[in-house]
């Protein structure tokens, strides 16, 4: 078997990626989230496939088809809630994965990092179109509000929105194409994941010390496969607790009301994992400015390799930047909270302060702290 896995054209690719892969001996549990994201993607594709077998992408039957899945299909309720809460677990792992990349300076592997950001954006797009499919109140109004943002683009905005809608409002054509997008995007994500891994295995993994680990590497299997299995066990336990005991805790009660274009919900808001970006969008009074800020809130991650001027790799020995990093995390939590609040004083003001702080930390404070720490090293 040893010879076969090293020489077989297909098996040797798997061997070099998951078995004999030289891995730093000191990577911590923060490195588990890559494999957990792979697990989440597999769960989402499988549960999604079974849901698609019973779902109908028609405005008159979409809502009742989801109810039919929960009531009449064997374990349909479980598949539906695993899929809905699986998306939340996916984003929790995604945020931690990106946060670890920032903390330990993984963004210096720029190709891997940039493909990762494209993956992040594609996952957000997939989650957005997926949220529209149950055709509840929040699905319909969320789709209307977010797609309407494109009308802020000068000259072509209105035409673009109508083109995406497939008519003059969010209707049957919109739902059908959103279902098509939601079905195809996970497979595009899978392709990007392979490219992400390809670039990662070209350079090798980063490690907590930030030092070159070529002199101290161990095979991925069995050391990290067993570690990943433990992580997967924790993830599945958390997902099952969510799906079985608190299936609706992260959802919106408005989505249990069928979509009605004549009745607007009191507070239109996306799923919890988009709230930070939604808060940044709402904090700017100008429509086009808000859309640009929304885009930049994610695309600014691409600037990390360019903004990094530190002589040290990662934040493990950099207390000033560490403090700024944790302020950034706290700031993102504040933005997430604000995104779910109504548009009124004092929430609007807190949102504006938190949005300015978010961009200031990344564009000003972090590069300044890098320079200060570089000068301290010289002392």
UniProtKB/Swiss-Prot annotation:
It is a multi-pass membrane protein. GO terms for molecular function: metal ion binding; ubiquinol-cytochrome-c reductase activity. A ubiquinone binds at residue 201. Heme b b566 binds at residues 97, 196. It comes from the Eukaryota. Keywords: Electron transport, Heme, Iron, Membrane, Metal-binding, Mitochondrion, Mitochondrion inner membrane, Respiratory chain, Transmembrane, Transmembrane helix, Transport, Ubiquinone. Heme b b562 binds at residues 83, 182. Its cofactor is heme b. It is found in: Mitochondrion inner membrane. Binds 2 heme b groups non-covalently. GO terms for cellular component: mitochondrial inner membrane; respiratory chain complex III. The keyword Ligase does not apply. GO terms for biological process: mitochondrial electron transport, ubiquinol to cytochrome c. The chain crosses the membrane at residues 33-53, 77-98, 113-133, 178-198, 226-246, 288-308, 320-340, 347-367. The cytochrome bc1 complex contains 11 subunits: 3 respiratory subunits (MT-CYB, CYC1 and UQCRFS1), 2 core proteins (UQCRC1 and UQCRC2) and 6 low-molecular weight proteins (UQCRH/QCR6, UQCRB/QCR7, UQCRQ/QCR8, UQCR10/QCR9, UQCR11/QCR10 and a cleavage product of UQCRFS1). This cytochrome bc1 complex then forms a dimer. Component of the ubiquinol-cytochrome c reductase complex (complex III or cytochrome b-c1 complex) that is part of the mitochondrial respiratory chain. The b-c1 complex mediates electron transfer from ubiquinol to cytochrome c. Contributes to the generation of a proton gradient across the mitochondrial membrane that is then used for ATP synthesis. Belongs to the cytochrome b family. Heme 1 (or BL or b562) is low-potential and absorbs at about 562 nm, and heme 2 (or BH or b566) is high-potential and absorbs at about 566 nm. This is Cytochrome b.
């Amino acid at each position: 078997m040893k010879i076969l896995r090293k020489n077989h054209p297909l098996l040797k690719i798997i061997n070099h990626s998951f078995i004999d892969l030289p891995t730093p001996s000191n990577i911590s549990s923060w490195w588990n989230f890559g494999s957990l994201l792979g697990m989440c993607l597999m769960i989402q594709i499988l549960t999604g496939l079974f849901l698609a077998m019973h779902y109908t992408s028609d405005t008159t039957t979409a809502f009742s088809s989801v109810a039919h899945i929960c009531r009449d299909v064997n374990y349909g309720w479980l598949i539906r809630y695993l899929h809905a809460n699986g998306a939340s677990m996916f984003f929790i792992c995604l945020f931690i994965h990106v946060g670890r990349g920032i903390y330990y300076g993984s963004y210096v592997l720029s190709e891997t990092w940039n493909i990762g950001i494209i993956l992040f954006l594609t996952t957000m797009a997939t989650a957005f179109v997926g949220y529209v499919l149950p055709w509840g109140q929040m699905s319909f109004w969320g789709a209307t509000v977010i797609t309407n943002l494109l009308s802020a683009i000068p000259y072509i905005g209105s035409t673009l929105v109508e083109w995406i809608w497939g008519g003059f409002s969010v209707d049957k054509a919109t739902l059908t194409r959103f279902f098509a997008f939601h079905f195809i995007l996970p497979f595009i994500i899978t392709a990007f994941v392979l490219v992400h891994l390809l670039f990662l295995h070209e350079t090798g993994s980063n490690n907590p010390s930030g030092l070159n680990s070529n002199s101290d590497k161990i095979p991925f299997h069995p050391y990290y496969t067993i570690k990943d299995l433990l992580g997967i066990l924790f993830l599945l336990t958390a997902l099952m607790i969510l799906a079985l005991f608190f299936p609706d805790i992260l959802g919106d009660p408005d989505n249990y009301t069928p979509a009605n274009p004549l009745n607007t919900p009191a507070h239109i808001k996306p799923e919890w994992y988009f709230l930070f970006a939604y808060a940044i969008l709402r904090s700017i009074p100008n429509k086009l400015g808000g859309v640009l800020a929304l885009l930049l809130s994610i695309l600014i991650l691409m600037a990390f390799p360019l903004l990094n001027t530190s002589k040290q790799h990662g934040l493990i020995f950099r207390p000033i930047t560490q403090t700024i990093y944790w302020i950034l995390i706290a700031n993102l939590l504040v933005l997430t909270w604000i995104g779910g609040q109504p548009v009124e004083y004092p929430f609007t003001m807190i949102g504006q302060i938190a949005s300015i702080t978010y961009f200031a930390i990344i564009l000003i404070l972090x590069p300044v702290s890098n320079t200060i720490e570089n000068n301290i090293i010289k002392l």
